[in-house]
Amino acid sequence: MNFNAITPDLFIGTTPAVNDYPRLRDLGVRLVINMRWERRPAPDPHRDPISFLWLPTVDSPLFPIPLRKLTNGARTAMEIIRSGGKVYAHCAEGRHRGVAMGACILVAQGYDPFEAMALIKDRRAIADPFAFYIRPRIVKFARQWEAQSLPS
């Protein structure tokens, strides 16, 4: 498992194996968000298991990440973070889909979408939040999130 701490409560990286769960637990991770279509998360065998959210997506410009999945992930992550837990977002390489999810979590925490993308790129060299098919999903999520957060 290769990962980076983006903020004190958000990590982005590669797919964790079952033997990585103790390390995640030691870091305070209470939620793992799996963005991989091709690989379902392995259950945590610990008596107090880490929660998993499987949001299968495809890493392809032909299949944009659905906003409903980004919203679901951000909402679930915010519940965990507000309760004092930490979140680990991943895809296969921690480059696109997991990065998009991480950026959306940061937006939900109040970051400007471009600041969120820059922070992730700064903390995880392989991350590519500015990819031509990833950036627009993050920006669109930010607009939608802000519109839903405005008082009516």
List PLM regions with ranges.
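Cysteine-based protein phosphatase catalytic domain of the PTP/DSP
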Residues: 2-86, 107-139
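A phosphate-binding catalytic loop at a beta-strand-loop-alpha-helix junction
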Residues: 84-103
